[in-house]
Amino acid sequence: ALIAGYESQQAFSSIFKTMYKQTPLEYRQNEVFYPLQLEFTLNKNPTAPDTMMQEISYATLADIPDWMNFITLVIDGFPCLDENSHLEQVKQYVQRRQALIMRDGSTIIGAAAFSYQTGSIDFLAVHPQYRHYGVAKAFLDFMMCNLFVGREISITTFREGDKADTGQREEYKRLGFAESELLTEFGYPTQRLILPPKQEKGDNG
């Protein structure tokens, strides 16, 4: 702790618990280790599609290897994510046509998985290099116009004040999501956010 620049072991433990929601000892004893950020390589020639929604397609089984590589770039938004479990879930979403991707050339720059039944977005992530390109909004617009017409959409994210949040919660609220109930998912404190149905022009209701 001292070598890393912390004033004391207590200071390190306090900050560690703020980020991981458990003490260093509990973290070791649980033997379930997960990163809050991994190294990633930037796309040397990024481009912003002129028509984002037109670049969205349903993911296929052939896309899954790229999807799993993409996961390592966006791990900061998914504490406690287990890659093996996620892989099995992605296969199911793909087979049900409930998984979407967006690419810049061969690079996946965004991915989403959702449930028709519950109206929930169960996974939504954007490549760190493209988080100011409107990718998340494009996915939402696509789903609201094609999949959840007239329905509200829900998503879960970090709770307010979570030090592990790199801006995901703020982005969702900027896109129109409103706070709903507090949850605990996979042992991690989260909160459900709700996006109301998109109103058509002239709809006074």
Map each language-model feature to its residues.
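Conserved active-site alpha-helix within GNAT-family acetyltransferase domains
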Residues: 10-19, 137, 160-181
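Conserved catalytic-core motifs of GNAT/GCN5-like acyltransferases
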Residues: 23-29, 156, 169, 173-192
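Conserved N-terminal entry element of GNAT/NAT acetyltransferase domains
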Residues: 31-62, 200-205
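Short amphipathic alpha-helix that is part of the acyltransferase structural core
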Residues: 50-81
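Active-site rim helix/loop that mediates acceptor-substrate recognition in acyltransferases
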Residues: 77-105
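Conserved beta-strand in the GNAT
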Residues: 101, 106-125
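Conserved acetyl-CoA pyrophosphate-binding loop and the N-cap/start of the following alpha-helix
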Residues: 130, 134-142
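Conserved GNAT acetyl-CoA-binding A-motif
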Residues: 147-164
